[in-house]
A protein has these predicted regions:
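Active-site-flanking beta-strand signature of metal-NTP-handling nucleotidyl enzymes
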Residues: 4-9
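Short, glycine- and small/hydrophobic-rich beta-strand elements in well-ordered beta-sheets
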Residues: 30-56, 60-66
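Charged phosphate-binding loop/patch that engages nucleotide di/tri-phosphates or the phosphate backbone
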Residues: 96-112
Length: 112
């Protein structure tokens, strides 16, 4: 199992819409998350001192090929449709890698 932390901005005028979407995630999206070996998935919201709201996600990956599982998720028509509602709410960080939407974070501490 590998733990992942990721961050992305959220457009201030879209915070309530994003929260509404995630209060009722589509069942097929949840099934795809499970099918792609993601467990214990949470998203947190916080407005920082710069006034910008950010989303922090945490999940545990239990599969053997993260890239293949993420490609499987990205190819799923229902997931693509879900993302078409979520992405306009998000504001990617300027310093993200070319292939990133959410920015990966470095784990600096963990305790069970």
């Amino acid at each position: 199992m590998k733990r992942y932390g990721m961050v992305i901005g959220v457009r201030p005028e879209k915070v309530e819409e994003y929260k509404r979407l995630h209060a009722a995630v589509w069942p097929d999206v949840l099934k795809m998350i499970q099918a792609c070996n993601i467990r214990n998935y949470s998203i947190y919201l916080r407005t920082l001192d710069d006034g910008q709201p950010y989303l922090f996600s945490y999940f545990e990956y239990v599969g053997k090929d993260f890239a293949a599982d993420m490609a499987k998720m990205a190819a799923d028509a229902t997931t693509q449709r879900w993302w078409s509602f979520c992405k306009p709410c998000q504001k990617p960080l300027a310093n993200r890698a070319t292939d990133e939407w959410w920015v990966s974070m470095e784990e600096v501490f963990h305790a069970d």
